[in-house]
């Protein structure tokens, strides 16, 4: 096994661990889920570049008669990238004492101020940073508001 194959296996394992944590473990942490809201995706150009570069590497490996295991590992990495960037839906998960946003736990007590912008972006001011929450469905903002009012 070459160093290239070892690095590919490590990247695949890391992406697989992230996908399992995001889909199965995170919703079960810190109590029952009160509300899970799908969010808008960020720009997909990075994901297109990532998957495109992997496809170029697969093509290069096949045309140069490279190791077959490397081709399979690159294909698995491309599939994991496709899942992470295009199939998985980013979401904000509200719990009793806080919420998960971008896979980070934030307690309600850390929220100093909340504003709603004209284009439907919920802005939460924390101690040292702002969270810009872009929901997929504008009606979900009312659900978030009702939940935050009832838990505070």
UniProtKB/Swiss-Prot annotation:
It is a multi-pass membrane protein. The chain crosses the membrane at residues 6-26, 45-65, 67-87. It comes from the Bacteria. It is found in: Cell inner membrane. InterPro entries: DUF986. The keyword Thylakoid does not apply. GO terms for cellular component: plasma membrane. Keywords: Cell inner membrane, Cell membrane, Membrane, Transmembrane, Transmembrane helix. Its main location: membrane. NCBIfam families: PRK02913.1 (NF002791). Belongs to the UPF0266 family. This is UPF0266 membrane protein YobD. The gene is yobD.
């Amino acid at each position: 096994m070459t160093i290239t194959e070892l690095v590919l296996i490590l990247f695949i394992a890391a992406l697989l661990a992230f996908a399992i944590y995001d889909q199965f473990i995170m919703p079960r942490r810190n109590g029952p889920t009160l509300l899970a809201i799908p969010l808008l995706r960020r720009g997909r150009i990075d994901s297109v570049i990532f998957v495109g570069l992997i496809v170029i590497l697969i093509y290069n490996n096949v045309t140069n008669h490279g190791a077959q295991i490397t081709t399979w590992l690159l294909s698995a990495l491309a599939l994991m990238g496709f899942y992470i960037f295009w199939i998985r839906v980013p979401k904000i998960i509200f719990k009793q004492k806080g919420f998960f946003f971008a896979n980070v736990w934030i307690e309600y007590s850390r929220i100093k101020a909340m504003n709603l912008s004209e284009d439907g972006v919920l802005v939460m001011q924390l101690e040292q940073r702002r969270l810009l929450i872009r929901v997929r469905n504008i009606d979900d903002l009312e659900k978030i508001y009702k939940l935050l009012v009832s838990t505070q």
